[in-house]
Amino acid sequence: MHTISDWLNLNAPVRCFHVRQLSESEWRFTVNDTIRVVASVDGPWTVDAKGVEDLKMHKLYVPGPAKCWTRARDKAMAAALAEAVSESETCAADIVRPAVAKNTPRRPVVKRRVDAVKPAAPDNLESWTKDDWYELDL
């Protein structure tokens, strides 16, 4: 069995992650606002209540919904508008857009999600598809 920590390591670099409890023994983990997996006590990705509480102590854990990038963009937009208004200029697109582009972090790249780790079978490598190669646990 693979733990949720293994899954988080597969999705590095992690900028933030969120946890939402679905039932008594299931949690949904969201990494970088885009990549999701459901972990449970007896699923392919295992975690228990103590493991979830330990992960919530990590510095990259963000409570609440997975909207870190949206919040950062909105904050940059508000700062650009406030700057334009404070300088008594018109809030035109040519003033606001460069400021937002400068102050907004880039949206994280979406990586492929690995649902299950397949064992390597070197005797039939010629028959592997592109997906088999991408889902390797290296």
UniProtKB/Swiss-Prot annotation:
Name this polypeptide is given: Uncharacterized protein 047L
